[in-house]
Amino acid sequence: MDNNEQNYEDFISTVSHELRTPLTSIRGFSQTMLSSWDKLDDENKKKFIKIIEQQSNRLINLIENMLAVTKLQSTNNSFIYNEIDIKPVVEQIIAIVKNQYQDQKFELNFSQNLSKVFVDKDKFQQILTNLIENSAKYSPDGGTTKIKAYTAGEQVILEVSNLGINIEEKDYEKIFTKFARIDNPLTRKVQGSGLGLYITKSLTEKMGGKISVKSVPINETESEITFTLEMPIRSIEEQARIKCNQ
């Protein structure tokens, strides 16, 4: 068996395990409600329905990430490049994420002369959504996600930071790998597929960018976690060449 076949089998095995957990919860709570509807009070009914909703959302997220991974591995995965402004894209994402994480705050800091980026808009939006949603998900209650964007030389830099539990330097690369989960008290409580950052890194690199993470302790219990996205500023000639090849 070659590496590709082994990687595919490992992927299917892990995905099957990840899918089984929410499906088991949905089936279990559905069966309980069907068999004991008259015995359950309104509070428990609402509680069970809420759990079913949460696990359904988790299942949808898993399936979307699995499809994204499959597309990444396909040689036919196409990119449609255009020059876009970052700010309206970020503002649109925040409006969506705020609806899911209503106790979280968001601070934006964009330089006045921020250059445009030459990217596939849908895939770039997926990158930013993963980073901003990830920050909100792993922030403490009432936490703040800070988003900063500026031009540095021939790069557009976008930083997404929040306060959270420290990520050790030895785990910096690990968190961008498939199905990676860093073991700490917060990640044990937060459900995730372990695919989001892998997809984010893969899409970033396919569009010529780079992504990194840094964790700086600020006290005994919290660190400032910053994900830095670097996207190249393309000249007119580079844009034309990329357009011809898409």
Residue locations for each model-derived region?
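Primarily the dimerization/phosphotransfer
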Residues: 1-33
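Short conserved segment of the HATPase_c
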Residues: 167-179
